[in-house]
Amino acid sequence: MTNIEQDRWSRVKGRLRSSVGEDVYSSWFARMDLESVQPESVHLSVPTRFLKSWIQTHYSDRVLSCWQAEMPQVHRVDLTVRTAMRCAAPAKDAPAHAEPRRDDGRPAPELRATAIAPVSATHEALGGSPLDPRLTFGSFVIGRSNTLAHAAARQVAEGRRGDPVMFNPLYIHSGVGLGKTHLLQAVTWAGNSGTERKVLYLTAEKFMYGFVAALKSQTALAFKEALRGIDVLVIDDLQFLQGKTTQAEFCHTLNALIDAGRQVVIAADRPPSDLESLDERVRSRLAGGLVVEMASLGEDLRLGILKSRVTAARAHHASFDVPLPVLEYLARTITHNGRDLEGAINRLLAHSKLNAQPVTLEMAEREIRDLVRPQEPKRIKIEDIQRVVARQYNVSRSDLLSSRRTANVVRPRQVAMYLAKTLTLRSLPEIGRRFGGRDHTTVLHAVRKIEGLVAKDTALSDEVELLKRQLQE
C-alpha cells in the first residue's frame, strides 16, 4: 500500500468513525483493512464471514459514501474475508520458556510447534473455534497493564474438576490487539492439556452459528445439553452476540453453567455495562463475576514485545538484527497495539532481507511512517465521570444514582449528566439508565440546566472545565 493510499484510508476511516459513532466503529470496523485501490473500486477485507455479512447488510452504503467523499470516481467497494490460519494443537511437553513471549494475540508466524497433540475430543465434537498453538501462557508477555488478567486466567486454567470456582464468570475486556484472545486460548490449551476437564473455546460468532444451525436441524436440545455438560466455557468477542433468541439461549447457558459450579471465561472490547445490545439480565450476570480491564501497552511492555518478535524472527533468519536504539524508537512511537508492533518488525525484516541491508534508525523511520498515528482522544466512561464528580463535590457515587433531591446532591448529579452527554457518545436514555434508571427527559433537563448556568456562572464554568481536564488526562 502506498503512502497516498494509506492517507486516503485513514481519512475514510475518520469519516466512517464520525458517521457511525465510536462504539459502532470499534465493534464492526476496527478490524477492517484496505487491500487495494483501483480507479473505480476499492477492495477491503475483514477477518470473519460474520463481519463481512453484517457490514454488507447494514453499512455497505455508508462505507461507499465515505469512499466517494474521498474518491468520487469509486462506484464499488468489494469486501472479502481474510484467509484464517487454522492451526493444530501445541506440543503438550513443550517448555513454556522455549516460546517467544508476546502480548498482542497474534504471535510470530515463524514459530511452529515441534510436535502435534490432538485438540480435545470435546472441543472438536462441539465445533469449537480454531485454536492457535502459539497462543499459550508461555508466550504471553506480562506487564503492568495485564498482570491481573494474566493471574486470573492462569488460576482458572490451573483449576481441577470439583475445585471451588473463585471467579465466575471471568470477564476480560480491552481494546483491539492487547491480548484478550491470547489469554482465552491459553486458558483453553492449558485446560485441555489433561483429560480431566472438558474445555470449549468459541467466538460469539461461532456460538450464534451453532445455535442457529441447531434450530434449523431440530437439534437445539442436543446443542444445549452438550454446552451445559462442559466444565469450562470460553467465549471470545462477546460484543458480536446478536439476536434476541440467541442472547436468551446464551443467558440460559451462562446461568446453567454458573449455577452448576462450572467455569465461564469471556472476553469483549468493552465492560459489561457498555454492551448495550445485550439484555440487562446478561449484563448483570457478567458484572457479578470478576471484570478485568487490560489497559493499553506501556512503553516497557511494547519494548519487550518487540524484542521477543525479533528473537522469533531469528529462528528462521539468523542474521536478522534490530539495534536497541531502533527497538526503543519503535516502542516510543507505535503506541496503539501489539499488532502494529508485529507489523513494524515484519517490515524491517522484509526490507533488510530483500535489499540485503542492515536495519538502521533511518530505515525504521521511513518504513513505519504510516504506523505512527496521532494520539486518539481518551475514551471516557460514565462510571469515571460519576467517580470524579462525586469526589469533587464530596458525595458518594450511590448518592448520584439515588432518588435524593437535596441541593448538595442534585447539582453534582446534573453536572455528571451534563458531562456524560458532552464527553461520551451515549444517548439520553442510556445516560438516564446509568443514573439510577432515570427518564431521558430528566437527563435533557439536567444538560440544559448546566448549559445555561455555565454560560452565566464563572465559578461553575471553571469547575466543569476542571472536571473535563481530570477526565481527559
UniProtKB/Swiss-Prot annotation:
GO cellular component: cytoplasm; plasma membrane
Gene Ontology MF: a single term: DNA replication origin binding
Region Domain IV, binds dsDNA, residue ranges: 353-473
Annotated region (Domain I, interacts with DnaA modulators), positions in chain: 1-73
GO biological process, one term: regulation of DNA replication
Region: Domain II, residue numbers: 73-129
Alphabetized InterPro entries for the sequence: AAA+_ATPase, Chromosome_initiator_DnaA, Chromosome_initiator_DnaA-like, Chromosome_initiator_DnaA_CS, DnaA_C, DnaA_dom, DnaA_N_dom, DnaA_N_sf
One Pfam short name: Bac_DnaA_C
Chain residues that bind ATP: G177, G179, K180, T181
UniProt-listed PROSITE patterns: DNAA (PS01008)
Repeat recorded as keyword: no
Note on domains (UniProt): Domain I is involved in oligomerization and binding regulators, domain II is flexibile and of varying length in different bacteria, domain III forms the AAA+ region, while domain IV binds dsDNA.
Protein family membership: Belongs to the DnaA family.
Subunit and interaction comment: Oligomerizes as a right-handed, spiral filament on DNA at oriC.
Its biological purpose: Plays an essential role in the initiation and regulation of chromosomal replication. ATP-DnaA binds to the origin of replication (oriC) to initiate formation of the DNA replication initiation complex once per cell cycle. Binds the DnaA box (a 9 base pair repeat at the origin) and separates the double-stranded (ds)DNA. Forms a right-handed helical filament on oriC DNA; dsDNA binds to the exterior of the filament while single-stranded (ss)DNA is stabiized in the filament's interior.
Protein's recorded name: Chromosomal replication initiator protein DnaA
Species in which this protein is naturally found: Rhodopseudomonas palustris (strain BisB18)
Gene: dnaA
